Amino acid sequence: MQYILNMRPVFNKEALFSDGTEYYRIPAEPKAGDTVTIKFRTQRNNVDSVYLVSQEQRVQMEICGTENGFDYYSAQVTIGEDIFRYYFEIQYGRVTCYYNNQGVCMKHEGRMDFEIYPGFDTPKWAKGAVMYQIYVDRFLNGDPTNDVVTGEYHYIGDKSVQVEQWNKIPAVMGVREFYGGDLQGIMNKLDYLQDLGVEVIYLNPIFVSPSNHKYDCQDYDYVDPHYGRIVEDCNEGILLGDDDDNSHAWKYIKRVTDKKNLEASNELFAKLTAEIHRRGMKIILDGVFNHCGSFNKWMDRERIYENQEGYPKGAYVSADSPYRNFFSFNDPNAWPYNTSYDGWWAHDTLPKLNYEGSRELYDYILRVGQKWVSAPYNVDGWRLDVAADLGHSNDFNHQFWKDFRKAVKAANPNAIILAEHYGNPEGWLKGDEWDTVMNYDAFMEPLTWFLTGMEKHSDEYREDLLGNSEAFIGAMKTHMRALHMSALQTAMNELSNHDHSRFLTRTNHRVGRISYAGPEAASEGVNPAVMREAVTIQMTWPGAPTVYYGDEAGLCGFTDPDNRRTYPWGREDYQMIDFHRVCLLYTSPSPRDYAAS
């Protein structure tokens, strides 16, 4: 009997655990020179010894506490200037195993070790924060006097269109359609957003631009007056008949070049950010710095600025333009009106910015990064569009984002730098470039396959992945390992956004796009119960749960442009809103345990 009582339990590998949260690494985000306490968990009285192993030492850890059937071991190390990598060695009788980011393994693989990047910290407010993404033109029209009017200008093959019916489904080629959503509309709905439980508002681009998506920036220094305030207008200047010459678009030119309109729009934005901050909320802007638009004052392909006082000639217009080196031109003999510039993915409406050729451009965009996170706007961070594409080489790209981080953090140390990125982001998440990413690989994609069997654009259905827990867990673990814990806790975890089909639409397992399936197919046979299941996971998963406007109200839609339908004011699914509200208020917001393992 005494022999049986003295028997040790079977070695429990499932009880072995550690990670990079503040429960197992104190402080969780150390600086060079800090002494760090690293902890490891085992089942109580279940192992002989635990060692903390790094490049430089192998330290035997000591039991520092026992709780709920677990022993906790700890050891202290001092962090230098370089990356500190470590793993654990566990001994039980004749058994030796190892533990790192891969979990328990019988053979140590160094590439999966835990890593500490000295000085890499992400804003505490962003860890686990509930975010809400707004595509401004489709949220709420708060000021009809600033609406784009039909025929105001010509863009990609046709004239601008003012949509009169708020609930109209966007056209397949709807980039030039405008519903009138604006900053005042957001201001009018701050009570709703705060009551919902939103902590951070993320706005798709708001700077001057001819499209409704505004990823083709025309002027980085000003909010588009169509989103802001128009105090000086032109009663004439609408393009008539076959006229597609934007140098005749006097109404548009007046609205977007008159400094009174531009400054009034910036002032309104400053009021919006002040009110958001007064409520204890944050705001993030969308930064599109890889490319601009052909309407941009630096290029001026539409000759909007050519004869406007106070604006130098654009690079398209003149070889002597001060902005010539902001772009790469393939034919030096094609001026005036040189169309031979490089476009991003060969799009002539999206000129690629030539940072390597212009230090002036390089410094200008760094100043733009600083401007909007500083007074009077005090924006709380940037979401960076196609961030890995900026520049013409990998080395240059990394150097730019290092300088961008220094500039932004110098202006606002608590600003977040969050990048759009598909694929492994490890190279940018070392503490000196991006803080985190939009979490496609380690959240949106695996979750949508698991719960719906659908690809995130609704372009493919795979029954073998629907409900496949092994594939889901494997994908999540694999891709989460690419994110440093500080990045994982702030990663933007979305179910839907402006580039992918609405999650609720994916629940109908219908492969399609609006161009051939039609808009009705996006809402046929959807399953709100699966949507609620997804929201529950979203609100409890490590990271920053981010709601795409209208998802909480039951909005459907195939991939863009159908995913950019207007918010269904007066037609909301109130049960879905209430479900989101409960999840957001009682599961996600601060004081949420964002650091939970």
Regions found by a protein language model. Name each.
Residues F40, I134, L193, L203, ...:
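Conserved, mostly hydrophobic/aromatic
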Residues Y586-D593:
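Conserved small/polar residues in nucleotide/adenosyl-binding loops
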